[in-house]
Amino acid sequence: MRKTVGRKPTITRDGLLDVAEELVREQGGSALTIGALAKAAGISKGGVQYSFASRDDLVRSLVARWTTRFDAMLNDVATDGPVDFIRSYIAATRTSQQAMDAKTAGLMVSYLENPEHLRETRDWYRGIFDRLAGASPDAQAARVAFLAVEGLFLLRINGIDENGVWTSF
């Protein structure tokens, strides 16, 4: 947050998303409201609504930010076929899991309750599936590895493997 003498505090859209992420990590997705974000950022509700018209818009922006970061990790590595791709997917998942906890995951689960958000997520996964396509044994093994990674991710974010014994891969 930036302050100037004689003026109310101002904060950028990205700054608000940073504060929103912190709120979710500390208090969970249900604590993320326009009012709570305004209070945490030290600005008015109108200041938040200037950047995010609704809570849904705010949550969608958070998920888009996370997805963009994850996609950037995938695209940073040149991949030649399903095996290389799944290796980069595993590395990106490992990196992103270090920043993810059950409270953040709860927000993502609630995000998927909206049919439009679910459609967007399905479209994202279709892009992943396309990169794992093929009839070769390597492509099939890459798909099995993908399913295993996704299963480990679900165990971790749902708090089933609290100590990370099974999900530390």
What is each residue range found by the language model?
Residues P115-R122, R126-F169:
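Hydrophobic/aromatic-rich alpha-helical bundle segments in the mid-to-C-terminal region
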Residues Y89-T93, T104-Y111, A145-L152:
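Short alpha-helical scaffolding segments that buttress acidic/His motifs in well-ordered protein cores
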Residues V19-Q27, A72-D76, L107, A148-L155:
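Solvent-exposed, amphipathic alpha-helical segments
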Residues M1-I11:
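N-terminal intrinsically disordered/low-complexity leader segments
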Residues T68-A105:
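Hydrophobic alpha-helical connector segments
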Residues V59-W66:
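Alpha-helical DNA-contacting segments of helix-turn-helix folds
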Residues G15, V19, L23-D57:
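Helix-turn-helix
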Residues S96-A105, V109-Y125:
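Conserved, surface-exposed functional patches that form binding/active-site neighborhoods
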